[in-house]
Amino acid sequence: MTDVTVKQLSEVVGTPVERLIEQLGEAGVSVSDADQTVTEEQKLKLLEHLRKSHGKSSAAGEGKKITLRRKSTTELRVTGSQGRAKTVSVEVRKRRTYVKRDEAEVAAPVEEAAPAPVLESKAAQIAKQVEEERKAAMDASRRADEERKAAEAARKAEQERKAAEEAARLEAEEAARREAEEAARAAEPETVAEAVEAAVAPPPSDAARPARRRRGPKEREDEKGGRREELHVASDKRGRRKGKGKGATRVAAAAVASKHGFERPTAPVVREVALPETLTVGELAQKLAIKAPELIKSLMGMGVMATINQAIDRDTATLVVEELGHVAVPMQVEDLDEELAVATAEPVGELKPRPPVVTIMGHVDHGKTSLLDYIRSSRVASGEAGGITQHIGAYHVQTNRGGITFLDTPGHAAFTAMRARGAKVTDIVILVVSADDGVMPQTIEAVQHAKAAGVPMVVAVNKIDKPEADPDRVKNELSVHQVIPEEWGGDTQFIHVSALKGTGVEDLLEAVNLQAEVMELKAPVEGPAAGVVIESRLDKGRGPVATVLVQRGTLNKGDVILTGQEFGRVRAMFDENGKPVKSAGPSMPVEVLGLSGTPNAGDDVLVLEDERKAREVALFRQGKFRESKLATQQAAKLENLFSQMQEGQVGTVNILLKADVQGSAEAIRDALEKLSTDEVKVKIIAAGVGGITESDINLAKASEAIVIGFNVRADAGARKAVAEQEVDLRYYSVIYEAIDDVRQALTGLLSPEMREEIIGLAQVKDVFKSSQFGAVAGCLVVEGTIKRGNPIRVLRNNVVIYEGELESLRRFKDDVNEVRAGTDCGIAVKNYNDVKPGDQIEVYQRVEVARTL
């Protein structure tokens, strides 16, 4: 067997070179360099020394064991649960134990004195065994050396081949490595499972140990079946990443088996999408987990033009969701209003009589407020602008027969909604009809409101003191509308009164009380209050003020109330005379302070125990109102898509409206919007209650709007802004004037109408030929005047056969500008020679006529 160097021997026995040189020195072998050769005799000498160092002699220790240990540590980089790389230390421990084969044969006791031939034979046996061991060790060393050299040569050839492949592959992977910087920083083995498996696998035989060495990730990948030659989607564009497994052999095998394929879903993902009443396109795309442009494309395919922030209704959303293959489910929103209705159901308590609520209705200027003025013994009408009522007045009057709550409604046509609200909350309607005017349009409307509300009527025939008064005429006209007097067999009381002199007022109150007794009006006094908003306004010093009519229960100062979209705690209450009150019972009108905003007239008022619940319901109602408003606006946009293209041809008057109370703002807004036509439109930019502020002026300037203040004024900042920005600001106290001014502004935007006016008619008597004009008609002017330069029509049997213009007008060979009736003339028609006797030539002119609404 060939000699080996110290370095090779250290690899065979698994001992560091420095330690082996030290052991050789202790055994008496002089070695100073790792490349120095060690002979077979020196190896045996070292073996003998090692045996002695373990407390064994050459003879006694031959039957004992020798153990060799080896420990190696490697580091692996693995990906953690959050995608971060971490280093794991892997320690491999190996142990080899060598036992002499014929242990029983050398177990003879040393103390016995053996004969000399036996000793010699034993010595020969030992020498023979040592020689066999030496030869076996030399053979094993030779084979290991040959295997190592062969493996080294194969490794070098493989490395050269793979280096060329690696260079080509790196070129192709450059783009992927730039996108996956995190993958490029982490260099891991192909799988953690392989590394762990290699670390804990049973070690090979001792003879194969020299050929074992730590291989790099590239070499392990080479031996596992070849390098990847292409990039794969399944590897997430990270061709340099190796770590995929969790440590188990089965998982690693499955990962290796499937890492070269595309991972595609086996079935389409079907989602259940909960849809509210309205939602934007962006919100729907988020629910569907798709990009908004794809959803917009689908909507366009269905004929719906929408942007990402545009709202669509539930029906449209359902159609597009089903078109995309998903399931649409209507969102079940918890209806807080229903819960509130159950929680605030009418309390069961002792019912006590309550005063009647009486609404005075009728045509404008028929004396409604004057009648109430006489009853209240105050001058209410003098305080109304123009002597007409502009909003509902609620008053509680004590009479000799008990209390009565009166509601005075406007009679003007613009206040239809106010009268409808008055009929809704009332018990009895007093219909005031002027004895001299009779039944008028608003009188008929008041009858319809009362019948729709199912409220009994008492007719007050007013102005009975006038000489031209005719009460029977009123009865006849009302009977046409099924209002039959009692004396005619009906059920309606007719009372003749004079609001100016007080005639018949007591009889009217008696009739009201009689009707109230028949109705047996009762309401619970105890418990939380409920009522309705009669009117609301924004007071500069006190904030939102609402006139509330209590219908049941008792409203106390400090109660938490909810009305429409507003809520708040009652900070103060005042009666109709402005005196503070602490509580109000059924049928009592009071002004309430402390709401979060001005509620709409007609909203229900409820008292709640919890302010948090009131806020929750108010916010819920605001959300519903916003959704419905958004849906309405969107529907209008979609319906008017083509009309908006021609919007430049439509004249528009922009109005910013501020009024003293909510009802007046609503009435004026409705009246102004009714003035719109197909050619001119009134656009209300904003409408509200309260004084005119600087922000209102800025808004009006930006939108080029006219600012209308109805019973309100601009503050100092607003007046300064008006002067600087030259905004048109107008104050009104009578609704007629506001409507008339806006109507005039709209009239100015109307394009003038072109009308044709016939100015002359001539009868053709004969036709002459002219070398200059061709056919010339000799005519007699029958009507009007024939003028040169005006357009004409040629009529035959009263049918127009030609339209053109006069080319020449002559009288006795002289050119003239006009010819009057009864005079002969010659008329040459331009570009027309088919004039015949008996035809008529009609001369007309186009006149611009200003249009009115």
Curated annotation (Swiss-Prot):
Q: Where is this region: G2?
A: 387-391
Name its cellular compartments. Answer: Cytoplasm
Q: Where is this region: G1?
A: 362-369
* Residue stretches making up the tr-type G domain: 353-522
Q: Which GO terms describe its cellular component?
A: cytosol
- Residue ranges under compositional bias (Low complexity)? 189-200
A Pfam family assignment:
IF2_assoc
> Compositional bias (Basic residues) at which positions?
238-247
From which domain of life does this come?
Answer: Bacteria
Start-end of Polar residues biased regions:
75-84
Segments for region (G5): 498-500
- Region entry G3, spans: 408-411
The UniProt record lists the keyword GTP-binding: yes
Spans of biased composition, class Basic and acidic residues? 131-188, 218-237
One annotated GO molecular function is: GTPase activity
Q: Which UniProt keywords apply?
A: Cytoplasm, GTP-binding, Initiation factor, Nucleotide-binding, Protein biosynthesis
Query: Region labeled G4 — which residues?
Result: 462-465
Residues reported to bind GTP: 362-369, 408-412, 462-465
Note down the stretches annotated as region Disordered.
51-87, 131-249
Q: What is its main location?
A: cytoplasm
| Cited NCBIfam families | IF-2 (TIGR00487), small_GTP (TIGR00231)
Q: Which family does it belong to?
A: Belongs to the TRAFAC class translation factor GTPase superfamily. Classic translation factor GTPase family. IF-2 subfamily.
Q: Which function does this protein serve?
A: One of the essential components for the initiation of protein synthesis. Protects formylmethionyl-tRNA from spontaneous hydrolysis and promotes its binding to the 30S ribosomal subunits. Also involved in the hydrolysis of GTP during the formation of the 70S ribosomal complex.
Q: What is this protein called?
A: Translation initiation factor IF-2
Taxonomic classification: Bacteria, Pseudomonadati, Pseudomonadota, Gammaproteobacteria, Chromatiales
